[in-house]
Regions:
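HIT superfamily nucleotide-processing domains
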Residues: 1-93, 97-139
């Protein structure tokens, strides 16, 4: 499928900050300072499930999940990573990668619906994004 027909779902646009593109996926930061929380969104029109990607794209997505997860873990020094493709509210395929700490407000439960989203401090989120870009794209 052509990437040119692809566009980011409106809810994802509203709830995230775009930090760049990997070969398959757009990398986004969720606008919630409670958790270091990233999304990978494969730029494939009509992809709802991972099985909607062909085998090469599925392998590329796993490579990107590993790359971004490793960067997030190194930057945050988190206790646990949560990685999930749920899509119950947004039908566009996207993968959540969330750095969790045993001290966070939702631990050990899932993060959804536990706390009202907290806006990021502008300086802190830019520092975080810069660190992510260095780790993800420069290794």
């Amino acid at each position: 499928m052509s990437e040119s027909a692809w566009s980011l779902h409106s809810r994802l646009k509203e709830d995230t900050i775009d930090i760049g593109d990997l070969p398959l996926s757009k990398v986004l930061v969720i606008k919630d300072a409670h958790y270091p929380w990233l999304l990978l969104v494969p730029r494939r029109p009509d992809a709802v499930e991972i099985i909607d990607l062909d085998e090469v794209e599925q392998a590329q997505l796993m490579t990107e999940i590993s790359r971004v997860s490793r960067a997030l873990k190194e930057i945050t020094k988190c206790d646990k990573l949560n990685v999930a493709a749920l899509g119950n509210l947004v039908p566009q395929l996207h993968v959540h990668i969330i750095a969790r700490r045993t001290s966070d407000a939702a631990w050990p439960r899932p993060v959804w619906g536990v706390m009202k989203p907290l806006a990021h401090d502008a300086t802190e989120v830019q520092t975080f994004i810069s660190a992510l870009r260095r780790k993800i794209w420069l290794g």
